[in-house]
């Protein structure tokens, strides 16, 4: 179930303060964050936010189409290496 509209979007305070500070200065430096749960708000458009995936920080450039989604959606946590192709020669027995 989605979040109630009367509550508004959830964004961690420390992340929002960093974005607003960069907007006030007019800079667009990469912002490192562990806050995968924060929702993307219009103030973040044009910024690059490095979202932690459990191992490293994945840079995510924020566009208008991403508004309303959470940061964690754009930094996958699992690495799929593909299924191993079955080799007929190795199955002979």
From Swiss-Prot:
Any one GO cellular component localisation term in the record: small ribosomal subunit
Keyword Ribonucleoprotein set for record: yes
Keyword RNA-binding: yes
Biological process annotations from GO: ribosomal small subunit assembly; translation
Record's signal peptide: none
InterPro entries: Ribosomal_uS19, Ribosomal_uS19_bac-type, Ribosomal_uS19_CS, Ribosomal_uS19_SF
GO molecular function: rRNA binding; structural constituent of ribosome
Keyword terms, alphabetized: Ribonucleoprotein, Ribosomal protein, RNA-binding, rRNA-binding
Described function: Protein S19 forms a complex with S13 that binds strongly to the 16S ribosomal RNA.
Protein family membership: Belongs to the universal ribosomal protein uS19 family.
Protein name: Small ribosomal subunit protein uS19
Gene of this entry: rpsS
